[in-house]
């Protein structure tokens, strides 16, 4: 694990191959992230590893019936869960795209382009610390990863390369659930 990571990405116990592929794509595409293989580690052990890494947040990908179901965030410094949960209604891995998408080198820079102008862009900016823009034309060729957020039935989060072609998995977010923590 690298020092100086901002966000640790991990899963629930015994994740499916699809969830692991999503985690690997996220870590490869989002600079400042690192993954922790959960295994049988307790929550306290995950916190200790996050503190040792210097992470600010832990992003948990929970799954239900072998599919990613929700994305939750834990603030390591304040020792509290963030009050929102992103409910995932589906993902599309690199293998499911109609053309072959090879894995690119790890990203060194990223930007969020929020065409939905909704809350998901603000959440991603808070957690990952990337700048947020509202126009796709302004970022072509400037960043290794463009996190494009579009409005559909919920939200569609696409990870694009600097050429604005697909870089990694895309995530369909059904809704943002605010909960009492």
Curated annotation (Swiss-Prot):
One of its GO terms (molecular function) is rRNA binding. Keywords: Ribosome biogenesis. Residues 5-181 form the Brix domain. PROSITE patterns: BRIX. It comes from the Archaea. One of its GO terms (biological process) is rRNA processing. The keyword Calcium does not apply. Probably involved in the biogenesis of the ribosome. HAMAP family: BriX. This is Probable Brix domain-containing ribosomal biogenesis protein. It comes from Pyrobaculum aerophilum (strain ATCC 51768 / DSM 7523 / JCM 9630 / CIP 104966 / NBRC 100827 / IM2).
């Amino acid at each position: 694990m690298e020092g100086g990571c901002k966000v640790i990405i991990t899963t629930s116990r015994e994740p499916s191959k699809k969830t692991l592929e999503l985690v690997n794509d996220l870590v490869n595409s989002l600079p400042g992230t690192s993954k922790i293989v959960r295994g049988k580690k307790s929550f306290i052990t995950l916190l200790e590893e996050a503190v040792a890494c210097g992470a600010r947040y832990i992003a948990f990908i929970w799954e239900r019936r072998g599919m990613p179901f929700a994305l939750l965030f834990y603030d390591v410094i304040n020792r509290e869960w963030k009050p929102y949960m992103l409910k995932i209604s589906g993902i599309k891995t690199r293998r499911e795209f109609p053309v072959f998408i090879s894995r690119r080198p790890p990203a060194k820079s990223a930007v969020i382009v929020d065409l939905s102008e909704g809350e998901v862009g603000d959440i991603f900016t808070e957690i990952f610390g990337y700048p947020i823009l509202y126009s796709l034309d302004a970022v072509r060729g400037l960043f290794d990863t463009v996190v494009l957020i579009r409005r559909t039935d919920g939200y569609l989060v696409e990870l694009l390369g600097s050429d604005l072609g697909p870089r990694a998995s895309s995530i369909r977010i059904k809704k943002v659930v605010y909960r009492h923590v």
